[in-house]
Each structure stands twice: as structure tokens, then as C-alpha cells.
Amino acid sequence: MAVNVKSSTRDIKELNPLVQVMLNTALAKIKKNKISPLVVETYRPKERQYYLYGQGRSVATCVGAGMPKSYAQKYARGGNKVTWTLNSIHIQRCAVDLIPQRNGKAIWNSNDKDTKKIIEIMESVGFEAGANWSSSPDSPHFQVKGISVKGKCFTKKNNNKFVTKVIQKKLKKAGFYGDYTVDGCWGKATDNAIKKWKKSLGWRVNAKIGTTALKKLLSY
């Protein structure tokens, strides 16, 4: 099926299952704060990424960056650049672009109070906020880097520091992380805390955080 490179996908169900849980939890909190969120883009096909990267770049530049020549010839053109990478986390189904809207109007202002609140809430559930990047900040962009496209569990081998910090904070709040430091490093202490927490709930004891466990943790 042909890809409509000029159209963005907004369907949350196109995201990794773990990312879906995180986003849905965040959206509920955002709405609770009387903010109307607008999902701008979720999953992005690779060809659409080629199309976006081609904006403001020459064929030679695109090919030099790693774009197949056929796509570079098709999508390279003048104008303003709209993205800085060929390997967006959107392609991996682990990123979302999200902004507030008021009176039916999208707010593309990184200094807007509702934008700042959205960033705060998205970070509270484990997203990395593009707004905080020192190079080429991207305030609508939120991602979960370092996990596999089809990964169904956060584990010692499938996580990142943003997610791990949230898991540690929630385990500490639930009384299972003791005096350990919330450092974003998934080690033996995090494994043991997850196992003790799961045992207290009568669940199968392991050190994995799947969608059900993640949803439960984020409710604390």
C-alpha cells in the first residue's frame, strides 16, 4: 500500500504497547488539569521520514546522510528544514508529538503555560521531552528511547534512564524501594524491588514491567 508521506498518523494504537500505556496515563492527567491535548503524530513510516528529511536539503546531502538515492531524488528540495534525523524514534513506534489546543486552535508555543504543563506530565510517566534537548530542542516531541519496537516489557536490558527513574520513584512511593537512590540505573535493587512488589500483589514474581504492571505503577 502506498504511503501518504504528507499525512501524519495520529492513532495511539500504532505505538508500542508500553508507550501506549504511558501516553494514555499522561493524557488522562493532562485532561484532569483542564488542558485539551492534541496528538499531532505517533508512528511515522520510514518513507515519510525521508520526505521530511528531504525538505531544505539537496540530493547529495540526503544521500550523504544515508537516504537511498531513489528517495533522495524524489524528496530533496529547497525550503526550510523540518527535521534533523533520518532515524526518528517515531519510526520505532516509540514517540509522539503532542501540543495543547485552546478554543479549537493548536498552540505551537514552547513557552505557553499549557505546553509546559504537558511537558511536566509527560516526563512524570517516563517520556524524554524534546523540549529539554540542548541541541535543536523540539517541544512537541516526546520519546521512549532504547526499547525494542515490539518490546512488551521493561526489563534490565530493555529500558532507559527516564523510564527507570519513574519506575524507581513509583516503587519507592509504594514502599518497596527502601533507601535506595532514584538514579535511573536498573540494577539488582530495582530487580528486587519489582519482585517484592509483584509478590505483594499476588502476581507472578519476576523483574519485568509489562503493560499491566506499568499501568498499576503509574497509578500510584
For each feature predicted by the language model, list its residue ranges:
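Extended, low-complexity, intrinsically disordered C-terminal regulatory tails
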Residues: 27-78
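Active-site acidic/histidine clusters and adjacent loop/turn architecture
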Residues: 2-41
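Short acidic, glycine/serine/threonine-rich helix-capping segments at coil-helix boundaries
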Residues: 132-136, 156-220
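Soluble non-cytosolic domains of exported or imported proteins
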Residues: 9, 13-21, 43-46, 109-116, ...
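Short low-complexity, flexible loop/linker segments enriched in glycine and/or proline
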Residues: 52-56, 143-149, 196
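Short aromatic/hydrophobic-glycine micro-motifs
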Residues: 35, 57, 126-130, 176, ...
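Catalytic cores and adjacent binding grooves of peptidoglycan-active enzymes
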Residues: 66, 73-154, 159, 166-169, ...
